[in-house]
Design a protein with these regions (language model features):
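Solvent-exposed edge beta-strands and adjacent loop segments
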Residues: 1-67, 104-118
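Homeobox/homeodomain signature
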Residues: 4, 60, 86-88, 126
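Generic "edge-of-domain/loop-turn" microfeature
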Residues: 21, 75-77, 93-95, 105, ...
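Oligomerization/assembly interface segments of phage tail-like spikes and tubes
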Residues: 54-76, 120-134
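Short, acidic/charged, Gly/Pro-enriched secondary-structure junctions
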Residues: 71-101
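Mixed-charge, glycine-accented linear interaction segment located at domain edges/termini
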Residues: 103-141
Length: 141
């Protein structure tokens, strides 16, 4: 099994979109190295601390699996009852989408932080995981 890891150098912007409003076959477009257009409203998510975004690719006998992970802290509560995809813009200006119109959808883990007495901010800690044949696909906003 061969494993590679892509880590974004820094996250400048995070936004969410409803999966149902995305174009079809994002994973296949990503494999073909075609940037995906995001033709719907992107809801910006304010964040604090340092978000992280990475994608681990495993190739095992011709089977490819990407696992993208996005971690960030925000004051905003996202609409968790809907299937959401995330548009991440790195500090180099390149944008990527995590998620697709079709299953599997990203899994959102939410932790509530009440902050510390020493001044750490209170808020919501999100960990988004998306496992597909291609995740963290370049996109146009």
């Amino acid at each position: 099994m061969r494993t590679t890891k892509q880590i974004l150098p820094g996250v400048k912007e995070i936004g969410w979109v409803r999966c149902e409003h995305l174009v079809n076959d994002i994973a296949l477009r990503g494999i073909a190295m075609m940037p995906v257009p995001v033709l719907t409203e992107i809801h910006n998510v304010p964040f604090f601390d340092e978000p992280t975004c990475e994608c681990v690719t495993e190739n095992d006998g011709g089977n490819r699996t990407d696992t993208a992970k996005l971690k960030f802290a925000s004051e905003d509560l996202l609409p968790l009852k809907e299937h959401l995809a995330f548009v991440v813009t790195a500090i180099d200006g390149n944008s990527y989408i995590i998620g697709a119109r079709e299953t599997p959808f990203p899994v959102i883990k939410l932790t509530i932080s009440f902050g510390d007495a020493d001044g750490d901010a209170a808020g919501f800690i999100y960990e988004i995981t998306h496992k597909a044949i291609k995740s963290l696909v370049p996109c146009h906003k």
